[in-house]
Design a protein with these regions (language model features):
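Arg/Lys-rich, low-complexity, intrinsically disordered basic segments
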Residues: 1-110
């Protein structure tokens, strides 16, 4: 008997949870299914803090050759750093943009 390739997932399994990291040296973590990704080094600034566009562009230039910022990189710290910490001047606007850009749902737990 053949199994259907398209399995319906419960709505909660499609949600990515974003919250403060449980690691002392990281700012945030995302939970994607059974994988947890910690990102953003504590003690370092990011675009949501300094809001300096020139610094944001330097960050992008420095990291673009080694990071996967496409949806295929969704389970990497580099993906989340780029789209949450270095995308827009506020965390909430970055979350909204990331959801729209990649067609995902992010639940931010404060």
């Amino acid at each position: 008997m053949k199994r259907s390739k398209s399995r319906s997932l419960s709505p909660s399994s499609n949600v990515i949870t974003l919250k403060k990291s449980s690691k002392k040296d990281k700012k945030f973590m995302v939970i994607i299914g059974n994988k947890t990704v910690h990102f953003g080094a504590v003690g370092y600034s990011d675009f949501t803090i300094h809001k300096d566009i020139d610094r944001m562009h330097r960050y992008e230039t420095r990291h673009k050759s080694r990071e996967d910022w496409k949806k295929s990189g969704i389970k990497t710290a580099g993906f989340w750093s780029k789209w949450i910490l270095w995308n827009k001047p506020s965390l909430i606007s970055s979350i909204r943009d990331t959801q729209k850009r990649f067609g995902i749902r992010i639940k931010y737990v404060r």
